[in-house]
């Protein structure tokens, strides 16, 4: 008997039978839910754990109701044990709102405080709690817990609940160490994957919930005690006895058989000719990695990642997408995967299905989002870049509105996210860890789902995806065995089995068939035959399908029983690549080396080093092919042109019909709401008001008359300098309908209540299309003695679903200025603009100024551009009708002391929104300073870093003039990583051996640099691997 089993028996009494009933829980405040039998058993088990233990792990499979069981435990603690709190619940940001709603719905007698928000809001919450500490549950996120750990440590928590507790699998992590310092009576860990990788992670969870038995320093003893579990079967039962008091796990197949059936299948696709060219080129890029025995694993992993990107979409490589970058069929035709997905989504939409679409790569999500926009599919998106409030809104919209597709990264949002509105899950590409894919699929197939669910995986035939997938199959089967039978050491063997084959051999898989032809292998498929039939938006089950097609009964019976994510056609692809693959690859190597030797003799170096992008031209070996005659070439060209013209015409007709239908619906909606649009009418380019564009050839020199010159003013554009005429103030906004803060947004709000009111109303009524101009008076608070002031809001920017703001679109600005010209002419008004886009990096002020001059000044509209001096109590009224522009004239762009037309540097920019920075920076003078560049020369390669954390750090790094490298190379100066296992340690040692110039540091170094606004010494942050 091991010391661990002895300690468990000495310290943890046997659990008695619980007499707890659901009526008891209802009496103590639980309501609006009927617990299933297994859920009530779970609450009983949790209540018994509270009597004699410091903590426990509720490890039910995803979707079985761990949240409601935990809420029931809190109701029990308050009602039966007379605990009035405080209880602390930690969860991911994406499911925090779900926790709040379910706490209020299932147990309204528990008062809940959501501890979130910015620093000021949290300080206010702390003050309120200090004056009135009467609450039961404090609900917050891991990030807030780490930020305000000192404050949260001051409380004595009766119960601590950690949702998605696999975040604690590393006992050296900051979250694990921080929570250990809290004063806690009982700890509850919730995780659908209590065992993911190895015994160290299991012990990390155990030492967190029961530190008196599982001492932190005894982790090696625990691993050694059960390392030989396969050769000593007696250890299996012993390990079960150690875990049994602390871990409860049920799976859907055992306790939720009433859930609608989940069917899972793999659909293969070919590759386009472009993808095949890049696939071959990637394999040939780093030849030494395949030839030498000393090649590092990192170089091969780089090749592996590039191959995965190639199979997804070739546009993931810079320089591949043809210019100009316009949406078109080329986006679909360039990728075999997207070609198949295109057909599949059309079939699914026609059948009334709703889809979760997963990808590992955020750049692939960008391409998919472009595609969905192009096809006109309704969608929501959620990945690491989406803010918390936007996430909740996206989830709510998908669940309550008729949204066709939810676009997600596999790990985004947390595994507790409920998306049962979907009945179809599509994995564009798979995760190396099969547990992550299972968690993702469980967002749709969980309690609350009323329709059968279909899980579809898209795999590139004869590509790296096949063998990666088959290895995930192998790992998942071993993991299932471990969980069910207790043989935890098999997890380590699963890792070694997956890496037993040389990575260089894995990369050769399928090359014989894949590269036997350079033609596209994309084919049309019968989707009804592959995906199955559906009726009224629901997939038919095997039984229903058999009634429709008795001939398929035998086939359906064969598939039954193999209904899990990683059934792979009964084939074992984990074996070595075929002899044909090896032979084809060797022939490719020989040919490539021969070409390189010839090139070296001629003094040309053709071989690219590892890490170089694939944007350059690729070698495309000539094929022996009968040359076409001139007549045949002409015939082919004409056919292609005719087909392209036909597709374009049909697409244009469909687009026009859809626009007309949408317009009629919008007009009917506006009528029902009593809404009247303030948008200026569209200007007919051939109408009488549009004069010839002779201005395009006019030289803007000092010979311009005062009447046609732009006037440059030092003053406040919200109080235009006009005589007796009407004045139109111009401001650029985005299409989101959310009024900004700071800069011109705040100034306009002080001038009038109308700007925010009319803009947000137009946003609510979907009246903010790009190029629209809202025109309305702003004299409600302040007015001139003579003449009226109007505000023209040009919708010139776009904000996408990920809250990313575009630059000012000159085409939209051009259209808006045309409309303003017509309105100004009718009202005999002058036009007053801020210095649009000033100090915005890459902004085309020259083009903007030409548009203003073209549409306004040279056509007789009195036009003024304002510069605002910050820091002064009031704007200095100073103006001049200059015949030279600040952008092209040296005197006008001089320092404040040299010219009255320049403005002082801005004192504070923190209050400006991004939209304000782009469109209202007229409040910042030409002398505005740029961002700090203290990270210049720093090139960072991130290793084993969470995607959200990496994205955040990269954003700051680039802001301060540093660079992030996707591939390890001699340019890298710092490796920022996290070491969580011996495998990571070995890989990093190999990296540092190959690239000795790089320093291995903790992410805290970057955070310290950003916080102190200087490049700090790395001495305190270096990671020692010896």
Curated annotation (Swiss-Prot):
Keywords tagged on the record: ATP-binding, Chromosome, Coiled coil, DNA damage, DNA repair, Hydrolase, Nucleotide-binding, Nucleus
Annotated ranges, domain Macro = 697-870
SMART domains cross-referenced by the UniProt entry = DEXDc, HELICc
Q: Main subcellular localization, coarse class?
A: nucleus
Which reaction is catalysed here? ATP + H2O = ADP + phosphate + H(+)
Q: What biological-process terms (Gene Ontology) are attached?
A: brain development; chromatin remodeling; DNA damage response; DNA repair
Q: What is its EC number?
A: 3.6.4.-
Mechanisms controlling activity: Adopts an inactive conformation in absence of DNA damage. Binding to poly-ADP-ribosylated histones activates the ATP-dependent chromatin remodeler activity.
Every Helicase C-terminal domain range: 340-494
An MF annotation (GO) of this entry: nucleotide binding
Note what the entry says on domains. Answer: The macro domain mediates non-covalent poly(ADP-ribose)-binding and recruitment to DNA damage sites. Mediates auto-inhibition of ATPase activity by interacting with the N-terminal ATPase module, encompassing the helicase ATP-binding domain and helicase C-terminal domain. Binding to poly-ADP-ribosylated histones upon DNA damage releases the auto-inhibition by the macro domain and trigger ATPase activity. Does not bind monomeric ADP-ribose and mono-ADP-ribose fails to release the auto-inhibition of the ATPase module by the macro domain.
Protein name according to UniProt: Chromodomain-helicase-DNA-binding protein 1-like
Q: What is the organism of origin for this protein?
A: Danio rerio (Zebrafish)
Question: Could you read off the lineage of the organism from its UniProt record?
Answer: Eukaryota, Metazoa, Chordata, Craniata, Vertebrata
